[in-house]
Amino acid sequence: TAEPEIGEDAHLLFMQLSGLGPVINLKQILHSPFTLHSQLMAKIEREAAFARAGKGGRIIAKINALNESSVISALYAASCAGVTIDLIVRGACSLRPGIPGVSENIRVRSIVGRFLEHSRVYWFNNDGNPETWCSSADWLYRNRLRRVETCFPIRDPKLASRVHEEALQNYLSDNTQAWHLQADGSYLRATPGAQAPHCAQLALLEKYGS
């Protein structure tokens, strides 16, 4: 990015890593083990508050793994409040979707294919003013509370739309390589059925070349 504030934040972050001093206040970047966890928890609660107010709520996240207990509890609470949640979790996931009264508004899918997936994208509807964030952090205890990780906003509307379409909606539409996590912890492979087959990774290869 060429955004001056994010560049300044990155400079301050590396200064902190290479020296001693108090926790720094960054303008745009969220960083663990300091602000990332609390701010993302607040964003989940904000979606729940919108849902309780009858405004709906929507969360989409693409990560490699999920086992941090307070995040799982917050997602369960958001689901109970009426927030629709889609999680694209490539690997281990301790959350259980589709449990009545707990997580019936949460869907989890895993996609493993040709790509070594490492993009982490968090999307919040924010009452019709969507926020798109990219991060180095999975939703694990070690990433959010024990390591230095970063999370930064995609401010440019065109770039945010591209990330939403290619990294999120594209993968939510996959019906050939996706596996749906069930409430009992098992996975059920998606099938096209009457729909046209769609492979998220193949779509990107066809768009950008193999």
Describe the role of every protein-language-model region.
Residues 2-7, 21-24, 33-210:
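PLD/PLD-like phosphodiesterase catalytic module centered on the HKD motif
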Residues 28-29:
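A ubiquitous short alpha-helical element
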